[in-house]
Amino acid sequence: MAYVLTETAAGYALLKAADKKIYKSTTLLEDLDTAEKVAEQFKVHRFEKFSSAAGALEEANAVIEGRVSETLKKFLSEVKQDKKATLVVSETKLGNAINKLGLNFSVVSDAASLDLHRSIREFLPELLPGLDDNALKQMSLGLAHSIGRHKLKFSADKVDTMIVQAIALLDDLDKELNTYAMRCKEWYGWHFPELAKMITDSVAYARIILTMGIRSNASETDLSEILPEEMEEKVKTAAEVSMGTEITPIDLENIKALAEQIVDFAAYREQLSNYLSARMKAIAPNLTALVGELIGARLIAHAGSLTSLSKAPASTIQILGAEKALFRALKTKHDTPKYGLLYHASLVGQATGKNKGKIARVLAAKAAVALRYDSLSEERDDSGDFGFSVRAKVESRLSALEGRDMRTTSKVVREQQKIEIKEAPQYNADADAGGDSDDEEEEEEPEKKEKKEKKDKKEKKEKKEKKEKKEKKDKKRKRDEDDEDDKKKSKKDKKSKKEKKEKK
C-alpha cells in the first residue's frame, strides 16, 4: 500500500494510491496528465485542516525546516494499517525526520517522486472535496505573504543593511575627497603655491579659496573664521610676495566650483559619519563599545549582515579582512596572519609589536561574545554596558602584557591606588669610614670570589683557544708558502733545462 503526503495552504492531505508502486513509474507525467487520471489513481484517505492562518504559517515553517510538528505527528500516527506502507513525501529533510519517529511507514523522498507531487498539486482542487480553485489560490497567496514576512523579520531598529551601505559610501567619499583636494591644490597652486605648504587641511584650503578668491584680495579678506590669527597673518604675508602666476576670472570660477564640491562633500561626510555612529549604537551597541563604530561597521559589511557575523567563531572574526594573506599562507605553507580588520582597532594599536597578535586574539574572542549578545539576545539593551565591561577586561589584559598602565576608555573606573607617605632616606655618615685594603679582601663574600674565579677561568680558556687558532693559522700559511716556493723552483729548473737543450 502506498500513501502520498501533500502539504497544502488549507491543511495536510494523505492520498491513497491505487497502484502501490506508482512512485517507481518512469512515465508519471504521461500517466497523470489529466484530472480524470489523477482522480482515478488517488483517493483522499485523510485530511487535516489548519485551525488558523497562524497555524498554517507554523506548519509551513516546520516543513521548510524539515521538522515534524505535533499536528503532523498526530495526523500520521492515527493512520490504521496492518502492514508497513510506503509514504511518499516531497521534502527529503522531512522524510528523514518522519523515519526517526518509528511509525509504520517506509518513507520515500527522491527526484522521481517530485513528478508525482507536481501532478497532484496541479489537479489538487479536483481531489479535495469542498475546496475550489479560487479559494485554494487565495489561501496559498496569504500563506506565501506570511512566510515572506516571517523570513524577512523586518524591524526598523535592526536594519544592518543601512550600515553596510553607509560604510561603503563613507569609503567612497573619502576617496573622492582626497582626489578632489589633490586636484584643487594642484590647480590653485599655480596661482598661490605657498598656501598648500601652510594649510594642510583640505577643507580649510577650499574655504580659503572660496572666501579670498585671487591672492591680491588676501589683505582685504577676513579669514578669522577659518584660520587662527597667527596663521592668517602668515597667509596674508605670503600672498603679497607669492611666486605664483596670474589666473583669469574663468579659471578662478572653475576652481571655486571644485572648492564648493569639496566643502559640500566634507559636510555630507560628517553627517554620514554621525548617522553611522547612531545606527551602530542602535544595532550593535556592545560591539561598538568594544572596537568602535568604524571597525564594527566594516566587520558587519564584510560578513554581509549582523546575524552572519554573530554566527562566526572568534578565529574567523580575528582574520576577517585578511583572506588573501590567509590563502597565500596556506598555499605556501607559511605562518597564517594574526589579524585582519581588527588591526585598526584602538586596543590592538596600543599594543607593541610582539603583543599585537595576542591582543587581537583576545579582542576577537570578546567581540564574538558581544556580537551574539547584540544579535541573538531576547532582551533589548542599547546602553552597551556589557561591551564596556568586556573592554575593561581586554584593557587589563593589555596592561598585564605590556607591563604598564594603559589608558582606559571604558565606563568601568579603576580603583585609585592609595598614596603611601614614606620617610625620606637620611645620609649615612658612617659609610664614609673606609678600612684597609687587606680587611676588605678578608670581608669579600665567597659568592663574589666564585664568580671572579669562574670569570678568570673563562678568560684563560678563551685566550688559550685564540692562541691555538693563531698557531694553526700560522702553520697553514707557512705550509702554503713552502708549497708555492717549491712550485716556483720546479718551474725555474724546467725552464733552465729547456734553455740548455735549445743552446745545444
Curated annotation (Swiss-Prot):
InterPro entries in the record, alphabetically? Answer: Nop56/Nop58, NOP58/56_N, Nop_C, Nop_dom, Nop_dom_sf, NOSIC
Keyword Disulfide bond belongs to the record: no
Acidic residues: compositionally biased ranges: 433-445
Chain coiled-coil ranges: 446-504
Q: Which domain of life is it from?
A: Eukaryota
Q: Does the keyword Nucleus apply?
A: yes
Q: Name one GO biological process term.
A: endonucleolytic cleavage in 5'-ETS of tricistronic rRNA transcript (SSU-rRNA, 5.8S rRNA, LSU-rRNA)
GO MF terms here are: snoRNA binding; snRNA binding
Cellular compartments annotated? Nucleus, Nucleolus
Q: What is this protein identified as?
A: Nucleolar protein 58
